[in-house]
Amino acid sequence: MITYNDNKIIITHSIADVMSSAQYQMSLFARTLVDKDGLDHAEDYTIKESDKPAVLIALQEVCTDIREVLLILTADVSEAVKIDNDNIVVTINKYNNNTNYVKQLDDIVGNLSSIGILQSWAKKTNLPDKAERFASLYSANMTLLGSVALRLAEVSTSDNLFN
């Protein structure tokens, strides 16, 4: 969800939604295993309540990474990137009105959050090839985050919307 408040962009993603997205990706992976060996692996690839502490740790790491990228590129994250009331919240101080870039930023934050959970899960379940794949996806999304943040800042500066 994207909201605009007092010259700020606030991007919010529910942890439940992010976990659901990660769970969907895991279920797709479990289906490919069924196709290979005929056994049902759905139970092996389910985020359980007992996994929630690991999920929160993974999401804290994602928040730290997002904050660092935004600080380096735009030097303007007001209330940082945090987990607040079961939501991931990214607050950016100054922005421009280019909704395409803001929407892209929102999508990337969601992607990074889901991929962070998947990466943590792959490491925990000892699937190094999957962990490596998720690490590559994570890195690609971080690069995307950086380029969109830079573009958002460029357009803002050229349109004099930072003032």
Protein language model regions, located:
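Structural motif
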Residues: 101-111
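Short conserved catalytic/interaction loops centered on acidic-Pro-aromatic/His motifs
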Residues: 126-136
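Conserved short "hinge" loops at termini or chain/domain junctions
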Residues: 1-98, 102, 140, 144-163
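Short, hydrophobic/amphipathic alpha-helical patches that form generic packing surfaces
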Residues: 111-123
